[in-house]
C-alpha cells in the first residue's frame, strides 16, 4: 500500500477543515498558534514512513504525554496502580471535579487530568529527578535526543493551572496523592509541555503497535499484556468525552491533546500522528480527527 500517496490525497481533502475549531487559549502560551497548521506522519513497524504538511514542526503534546507516564508507571508497578485510578470512561470533561468527589478521590481513568496526576505522582515517587526521567524516556522511545520541554508553556500552565491544583489537593485529602501537590503538578505541567513533532510521535509509540517492543531498537519497553491494556484504555478513554464518536468514526486506539495532536495505533502495523490546533468542544483536533477518519476510510486500517 502506498501510504505517501494516501497521505497526499488526505492533504488535499482536508483543506476545507483547516482553521476550524478553537485553539486552547485558556493556556496563554498556546493562544497564538495558527489554527490552520496541519501535519501528519506514519511509521510502520517494518520501517516505512510517510509525512505531509507540518509533520516536522514541534508542538506542545499536552495530554498525549499521559501515555508516556502511564507506560513508565505500569513498568514500575502494574498492580497497585489500579487501586488508585480506574479504567472506565468518565463521560465528563477532562478537568471535572464533580465526578472526583462522588468517587472518593479515585479518578475514572489515567487519561483525564486527575488520573494523570495520580500517575505522575507514582512516577515522582520512583525517581530522584522525575522531570529528567520523563524526558530521558521520551527521548529514548522517539530516538531523538533533541526533544525538550517548552518552558514557556510549562510556566504558562503553572500560572493558570488552578483547577489542576484544586484536583490535586482534593485527591490529597483522600490520600491519593502521596507527594507534595505543587511538586507533582510542576512535573505534570512540564510533561504536558513536551515539544514534539508528528514524526517524533509516530516513532515514539511504535512499541504500542509492536506488543511492547520498540522495533527501531528491538528494546522491550513494556510487556505485551501491558501494551494491549494501554491500547484498550486509549480506545475507551483516550479522546476525552467524545471517545464513542471517535471510535465510531476512526476505530483505533488513540490519544489526543489540547495542543492539537492525536496519536493513533494500528496494532501489529503502524502508528499515525496528526496535528492541527483547531479543537472541537471536547478538546480534540477537528481537522486531525477528520484526517484519521479519511485514512481509515481509504485504507481499511481499523481494529473492527
Curated annotation (Swiss-Prot):
The keyword Transferase does not apply. GO terms for biological process: glutamate biosynthetic process; glutamine catabolic process. Substrate binds at residues 63, 113, 157, 164, 188, 240, 258. Transmembrane segments: none annotated. NCBIfam families: Gln_ase (TIGR03814), PRK00971.1-1 (NF002132), PRK00971.1-2 (NF002133). Belongs to the glutaminase family. This is Glutaminase. The gene is glsA.
Amino acid at each position: 500500500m502506498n501510504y505517501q500517496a494516501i497521505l497526499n490525497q488526505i492533504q488535499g481533502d482536508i483543506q476545507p477543515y483547516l482553521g476550524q475549531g478553537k485553539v486552547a487559549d485558556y493556556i496563554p502560551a498556546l493562544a497564538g498558534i495558527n489554527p490552520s497548521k496541519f501535519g501528519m506522519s506514519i511509521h510502520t513497524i517494518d520501517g516505512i514512513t510517510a509525512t505531509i504538511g507540518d509533520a516536522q514542526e514541534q508542538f506542545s503534546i499536552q495530554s498525549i504525554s499521559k501515555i508516556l507516564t502511564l507506560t513508565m508507571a505500569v513498568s514500575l508497578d502494574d498492580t497497585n496502580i489500579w487501586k488508585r485510578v480506574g479504567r472506565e470512561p468518565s463521560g465528563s470533561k477532562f478537568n471535572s471535579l464533580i465526578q472526583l468527589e462522588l468517587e472518593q478521590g479515585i479518578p475514572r481513568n489515567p487519561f483525564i487530568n486527575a488520573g494523570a496526576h495520580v500517575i505522575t505522582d507514582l512516577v515522582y515517587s520512583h525517581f530522584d529527578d522525575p522531570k529528567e526521567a520523563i524526558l530521558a524516556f521520551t527521548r529514548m522511545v522517539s530516538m531523538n535526543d533533541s526533544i525538550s520541554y517548552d518552558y514557556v508553556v510549562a510556566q504558562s500552565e503553572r500560572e493558570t493551572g488552578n483547577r489542576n491544583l484544586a484536583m490535586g489537593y482534593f485527591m490529597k485529602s483522600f490520600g491519593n496523592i502521596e507527594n507534595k501537590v505543587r511538586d507533582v503538578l510542576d512535573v505534570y505541567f512540564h510533561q504536558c509541555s513536551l515539544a514534539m513533532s508528528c514524526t517524533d510521535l509516530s516513532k515514539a509509540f511504535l512499541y504500542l503497535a509492536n506488543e511492547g517492543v520498540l522495533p527501531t531498537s528491538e528494546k522491550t519497553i513494556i510487556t505485551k499484556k501491558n501494551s494491549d491494556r494501554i491500547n484498550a484504555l486509549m480506545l475507551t478513554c483516550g479522546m476525552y468525552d467524545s471517545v464513542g464518536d471517535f471510535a465510531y468514526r476512526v476505530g483505533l486506539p488513540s490519544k489526543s491533546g489540547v495542543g492539537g495532536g492525536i496519536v493513533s495505533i494500528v496494532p501489529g502495523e503502524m502508528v499515525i500522528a496528526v496535528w492541527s490546533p483547531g479543537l472541537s468542544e471536547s478538546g480534540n483536533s477537528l481537522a486531525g480527527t477528520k484526517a484519521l477518519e479519511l485514512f481509515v476510510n481509504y485504507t481499511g486500517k481499523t481494529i473492527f
